[in-house]
Amino acid sequence: MAESNRAPSKQVRHFRQILLWPLQLMPIREGAQIQKHWEVLEQEREGNPWHEVLDEFTGDPGEFKERHYNEFVTFLPHVQRFLYGESRRAGDEAERGASPMRVFRREDVAAARLTRQAGDPPLTLNVAHVDLYFFFDIDVVLLAVEVFVDDLPLVIAEDVLYRFGRAYPAGWDEEGEGLHCMHKAEWLSAEGAVLAVSDYEKRDKYLSFACRHRAPCLAAHWAFLLRPLVLDHADERGVIRYRQIEYYRMPVMGYLAMDNPRTLSRGDFIRLGLVTAAGTDEALPYSDRHVADFEENFCYDRYWSDQVEERNTRYLCCGHALIAVGGAHSRVFTDRETGVFSQFRHQYFLLFLIAHFHKAALLMISDRLVDALNRLEVHNAESVKRFKRAIRQQFEIFLRFTHRYWFHELSDQAQSKALYRLCARHLGTDALFEEVQDEIQEMSDYLDSDSLRRQANTVMRLTIVTTFGLIGTLCTGFLGMNLIDAADNPLLERVLLFLLFLVPSVALILYFIVKSKQLSEFLEALSDERLPARAKLRTLTDVWRKRQRPFT
């Protein structure tokens, strides 16, 4: 086994893992642009374990620690407004200028008991946080689960990073075990009671669900953790419903404090940085050619050196994962107020969250555009109207997302700036932003051109009515306005004469509007000096010929 080929010194003195899973939220109020899903969680209902977490700025200033201050000043002012809300003076209302990000936490889950493979002893990880991150005006929620344990062999740490964050199995082996998943995962309460157990081995459950719904089914322990949020395709009742929007492997952060991080082999770093299965020291998870540029593309080695042992820290990032490896005896790496440990749980967690929030929000908007196109029935006038409203709504949401949430730079601190750029580059958020922007702009341009076309048609119809109405106006004006002297007639007779004139006038105007397109073609032909008289006459007779016209 891989464990037998590992040096006994490769122990992780403190291991910490944060899973961050973006999900798309379904509307709870049809027609409303802004869906405040968190308001449902604010209501005290039976079976709702979530409560809102107030940030450090709303509590007692005496509880405001140096790590909170360091986190705050790391970010640029526009990012601070996103994370913490607008700056305010004493006496200002708390709700005014509040952060557009809302955090909810459940505290009934105290530990995770994991069995990697059948026959292995279970491993119990402490649960630090289970949080949900909501964002104003964006129908995306991020589930964050933070676990930790001390004194863990490196091979097991690699396996936990690789296997733990799986929403459902990718397949099954010959024994019926879920591929690349934990053999068993359990959520435990503070008293040790089992709250939920994974069901990766239930092959028929996943196959039948995918066949019936054309969507994957979540493992039981992850579905439990999200309740009262429920999977949109499931038969389970729930007001807040979600859909998978990214890969079933949850983005992951890892913190590994080693006795001597310099003893890790190149294969160890590749397995950690690319989050692959555990292996031997000598073996690489991929071919030499495939990982030839690993250090250049996936490592941030600002403080990784033989000469600077106290600050020997290496960061690994592939977009899907952000891993920090350092010395367990280095205060710079382990200090809980100012060290890398604090930065990992605060600054780096937030920049990792923002990068994945950007990607999830863009994917959500793109998905909504595709959904609007799929619902469009071009021969149904009501469907066309709904399509136009949906596109304009997504255009407005995208504009608000751009101005409220989208930024290329989060910090001017060199390390935070570099790590965010590395993460965003691997996630491809800049290219995705341009792609979604182009999609929305193309649809918006089409709707604008269609609106101008309809306005031009309306002007044309009014012009036709005015042109042919001018004939009657000239005739009555030439012959005199008072063709019928009825001023002294009885009132009833005058009313009847008025109606006698009104009805055919309205009918004639409506007839001109109905025939306005054909009449405009006749007027255009009439003004064309190149057409012979017979062709112009044929154009006039075409006014009364029936022809099939496409829906516009």
Model-derived features with residue positions:
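Membrane-associated alpha-helical segments
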Residues: 344-485
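A short linear-motif detector with a strong N-terminal bias
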Residues: 119-124, 294-295, 301-304, 385
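Generic detector of short, locally flexible boundary/turn motifs and exposed helical patches
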Residues: 97-108, 279-292, 399-402, 441-444
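N-terminal extramembrane/targeting module of integral membrane proteins
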Residues: 256-377
